[in-house]
């Protein structure tokens, strides 16, 4: 499914339902991520409107570590921070946003989003990409619940912007996806 800039405007609106402005990636930058790497965004639509989405960023190792150790947050990530080199693609995977429109927050939408996301990641791994580590930065209790319950990522550290970094080894994550 091809996404448009208007889809990213809607995603930014969804973000503002939950996250403080300083933690929201601007639609124009998120759209650049998508244009550089179409695998970076998975959406659920209802009547052609985005109602839920996940940003899955393949980050350069040094950028990944800056996010992991609270030296940088999602809203500062630029398209130049993405790892697009085929030999290193998806080594350091960052779930930068998992968000569902407040009018569509139900288990069906969540399961659909997780299912589509899992299939996308498995498809990429089956093309020969090696995931070394997976990370999510959770700003809400709901995000922490999704990250821990469905993605099985483990709490790593609290950030200066009131969120919690969660991580999991790539091997553990791949094993989980195949269950």
Q: Where are these predicted regions, by residue range?
A:
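Alpha-helical elements of Rossmann-like donor-binding domains used by nucleotide-donor carbohydrate transfer enzymes
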Residues: 10-14, 29, 112, 116, ...
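Short beta-strand micro-motifs in enzyme catalytic cores
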Residues: 40-42, 91, 161-167
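Short amphipathic alpha-helix that is part of the acyltransferase structural core
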Residues: 1-28, 36-58
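Conserved acyl-donor/pantetheine-binding loop and adjacent beta-alpha core of acyl/acetyltransferases
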Residues: 55-97
């Amino acid at each position: 499914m091809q996404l448009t800039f208007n889809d990213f405007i809607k995603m930014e609106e969804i973000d503002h339902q939950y996250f403080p402005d300083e933690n929201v990636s601007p639609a124009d930058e998120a759209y650049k991520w998508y244009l550089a790497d179409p695998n970076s965004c998975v959406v659920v639509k209802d009547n052609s409107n985005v109602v839920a989405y996940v940003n899955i960023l393949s980050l350069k190792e040094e950028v990944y570590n800056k996010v992991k150790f609270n030296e940088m947050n999602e809203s500062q990530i630029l398209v130049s921070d993405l790892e697009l080199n085929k030999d290193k693609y998806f080594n350091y995977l960052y779930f930068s946003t998992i968000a569902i429109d407040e009018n569509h927050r139900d288990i069906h939408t969540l399961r659909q989003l997780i299912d589509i996301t899992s299939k996308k990641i498995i498809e990429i791994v089956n093309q020969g990409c090696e995931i070394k580590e997976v990370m999510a930065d959770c700003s809400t209790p709901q995000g922490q619940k999704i990250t821990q319950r469905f993605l099985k990522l483990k709490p790593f550290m609290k950030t200066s912007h009131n969120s919690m970094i969660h991580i999991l080894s790539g091997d553990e994550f791949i094993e989980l996806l195949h269950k």
